[in-house]
Amino acid sequence: MAKVWSKRFDNALDTFIEKFNASIFFDRKLILEDLDCSIAHAKMLGKTEVLSSTEALQIINGLESIKVDYLEGKFSPGPPSEDIHYCIEEKLISLIGETGKKLHTGRSRNDQVGTDLRLWLRKEIDNNEILITDLQKSFLNLAKSNIYTLIPGYTHMQRAQPLSLAHHLLAYIEMLQRDRERFKEVRLRVNTSPLGAAALAGTKIKIDRHFTAAELGFEKIYKNSIDAVSDRDFCIEFVSASALLMSHLSKISEEIILWVTDEFSFAKLTDKCATGSSLMPQKKNPDVPELIRGKTGRVYGHLQALLTMVKGVPLSYNKDFQEDKEPIFDTAETISSCIKAMTILINQGIEFNVKNLSDSVENDFSNATDLADYLVGKDVPFRTAYQVVGEIVKYCLERKILFKNLKINEFKKFHPKFDEDVFLDLKPFNVVKSRNSEGGTGFVQVEKEVNNWQKKLLL
């Protein structure tokens, strides 16, 4: 099939180069956005009388017909069309004849594809907002039933201090909230229309850029036609926000993987979210969180690919930009599937072993800070109290015992201000209960935050 630009050339394009150059294999994903973009453009050309009302209506009806055929499975874009834009234009011309050739008046594929991609990304961002909110709700429901469940808190993967399990789960909700906010900020910049910038310099054709922007739901237009077609920073921002989201999902996944090991035994996976081994019949594998953790790398890779793609590219549009779509499409699909999988996992796939969690905080030194705080409450300087407790920890380790195994006279050997009430302060439940600074793990604070999140998430 002859290219629309072929009259400039004496010889046909090499068949391999033709395939190498084509983007129809992946940019056909933009078909609905391209149709909407073209319909808005045709309406504008009719409004500005570049086209007669009859011509504009004929083009619009033709495009609507193509949309219906596509949605009903009667039209499938593909080769030999070079890209989705030519594919639709060729289909339109075959439907309505010569009038279809007037559709591209006053625009270029450069501003057209930029518009399509922004429309597509806007839809994906709106979908992510729903998916991330659903995941937050899943964590909140789990937190509500585990306010008084204790779990060891870690720093450097070493036991640090006991926590409310709900407090731990609420931390994920906070991270996901920042992810939502990042996507909203990306949407603000995505929601700017480049349509009408044409190839790079604008057009002498009488157009109304504000009309097409409004038709397509954009809040504003690009003020510089070169800038409108020259950058893919909005794509990079989307993948960057996605990479940060995946880092959080990967963090959550890693913890779940650890929790369900025999060594931790803090939780178990239900049959709905676990798989077995082809060789070892005893196995129950955490494939879902492992896959999410593994897929994080591909999103990171897409971010690096896009950053490299735009590095050193001069103004304005360059063919390099064709390489933006596959990373964008795969990133969007990856994060969507990972959020959905994590939501199912949290809703149906994990059961906490409350007894093991309770036993774990009863048999360690994670209450050491509270022992120091006890002395601080007796007017002992913190640094002195810290050193005293360090000596007590060493004493216990040498004898393979815990604080709770000491007698009061043993405590008093280290400092005279220890009294019988120290044993109450050392109970893990009381340790957690006492941490009532704002944002802390104390039960009052956790209940407060659960209630706050119920209001925010409309639960």
Swiss-Prot record:
Reactions this protein catalyses: 2-(N(omega)-L-arginino)succinate = fumarate + L-arginine
Pfam families: ASL_C2, Lyase_1
Involved pathway(s): Amino-acid biosynthesis; L-arginine biosynthesis; L-arginine from L-ornithine and carbamoyl phosphate: step 3/3
E.C. number: 4.3.2.1
GO cellular component: cytosol
InterPro entries (UniProt xref): Arg_succ_lyase_C (IPR029419), Argininosuccinate_lyase (IPR009049), Fumarase/histidase_N (IPR024083), Fumarate_lyase_CS (IPR020557), Fumarate_lyase_fam (IPR000362), Fumarate_lyase_N (IPR022761), L-Aspartase-like (IPR008948)
Keyword line: Amino-acid biosynthesis, Arginine biosynthesis, Cytoplasm, Lyase
Compartmental location: Cytoplasm
GO biological process, one term: arginine biosynthetic process via ornithine
GO molecular-function terms, A-Z: argininosuccinate lyase activity
Keyword Lyase: yes
CDD domains associated with the record: Argininosuccinate_lyase
SUPFAM superfamilies linked to this entry: L-aspartase-like
Domain of life: Bacteria
Family classification: Belongs to the lyase 1 family. Argininosuccinate lyase subfamily.
PANTHER family, per the entry: ARGININOSUCCINATE LYASE
HAMAP family for the chain: Arg_succ_lyase
Protein name: Argininosuccinate lyase
Natural source organism: Prochlorococcus marinus (strain AS9601)
